[in-house]
């Protein structure tokens, strides 16, 4: 009898812990709001190489953008530039954009290989881009917070291990992307630690 009660308590404890963990994950995932392509009036993409993302790679866009600036206009400009005759890309180069104010925007389809403008092959990479030049300005708190949640969201949603997290410069010798101020958070392990906390 005591044995039966003991094991019943163990089962109840496990269920409680699982529900608690699930509730925690659902709570922060509700904070991840992705603005769709339709809201920044994206042009239709050109059919391109397909892939399955198996790692997460972070970039910065590399030109000045303040919290008060128009992120939608910037993203639309990136698409026009990338799909122009000089590059002939299929779409914007990244799968997601994060503005300085923390808003997250949908980029190209995650099933489509991204672009990097450098020598590394982005096949298999899910690309998240922080708008702005993070070699020149500190990462805004809202942008950093959204980046951490977005990495965790992508890890959980697309079943990509967070341990694969890296940056553009980790794959290319031709760039300082994602900028020294953002890269500091990767070097000291802060971003990966915070992502891990969300996923636990």
Region spans (language model):
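Short coil/turn segments at secondary-structure boundaries
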Residues: 3, 66-69, 138
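Basic/polar, cationic surfaces and motifs that engage anionic cell-wall
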Residues: 19-61, 100-116, 121-200
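Secreted/periplasmic proteins that engage bacterial cell-wall peptidoglycan
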Residues: 49-110
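Bacterial N-terminal signal peptides that target proteins for export
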Residues: 1-8
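Bacterial N-terminal signal peptides
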Residues: 8-16
């Amino acid at each position: 009898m005591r044995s039966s009660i003991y094991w019943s308590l163990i089962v109840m404890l496990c269920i409680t812990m699982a529900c608690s963990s699930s509730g925690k994950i659902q709570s922060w995932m509700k904070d991840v709001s992705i603005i769709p392509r339709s809201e920044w009036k994206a042009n239709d993409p050109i059919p391109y190489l397909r892939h399955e993302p198996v790692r997460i790679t972070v970039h910065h866009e590399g030109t000045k953008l303040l919290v008060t600036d128009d992120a939608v206009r910037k993203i639309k400009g990136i698409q026009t530039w990338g799909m122009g005759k000089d590059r002939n890309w299929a779409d914007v180069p990244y799968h997601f954009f994060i503005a300085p104010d923390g808003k997250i925007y949908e980029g190209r389809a995650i099933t489509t290989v991204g672009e990097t403008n450098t020598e590394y092959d982005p096949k298999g990479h899910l690309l998240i881009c922080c708008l702005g030049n993070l070699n020149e300005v500190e990462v805004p708190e809202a942008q950093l917070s959204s980046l951490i949640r977005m990495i965790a969201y992508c890890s959980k949603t697309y079943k990509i291990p967070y341990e694969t997290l890296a940056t553009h410069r980790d794959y290319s010798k031709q760039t300082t992307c994602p900028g020294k101020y953002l890269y500091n958070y990767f070097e000291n392990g802060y971003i990966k630690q915070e992502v891990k906390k969300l996923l636990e």
